[in-house]
């Protein structure tokens, strides 16, 4: 799984906007499965991978569809901790009193929290769950290093 920083880097695809394609929310349904184009139209559950446009790096489904676990423990502001190795030990590492929750990114197709809204799927949106949380709106993404 990617770290939180790796996930956001891939989701932004080099952009500093809310979404990899810019800030124009009217384009969002071209890139994401949200509540507005699933539940509100009578569709339930995750959609087929690659059913929406990829970002400019060719990555699909980073916005909506299912939220994705990342390696990090949840901290309210993760930027100071990006390079702290003990926050990147994977879901099976023991939680501790300081960081008992895990991070989930990307938003989802449905209404768990605000995950199915334009705000809920933006690149910087973060969710926190216990490591044993199970939901049909949470999944994971495999990641790999790209040889230089």
Please give the residue ranges for each predicted region.
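Signature tryptophan residues that serve as conserved aromatic anchors
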Residues: 7, 33, 57, 67-69, ...
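Short, solvent-exposed coil/turn segments
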Residues: 26-27, 42-45, 52, 97-99, ...
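Surface-exposed recognition segments
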Residues: 15-16, 63-148
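Short, well-ordered junction/capping motifs at the entry into regular secondary structure
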Residues: 30-63, 79
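Proline-centered helix-kink/hinge sites
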Residues: 1-2, 54, 131
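Short, well-ordered surface patches within globular domains
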Residues: 1-29, 69
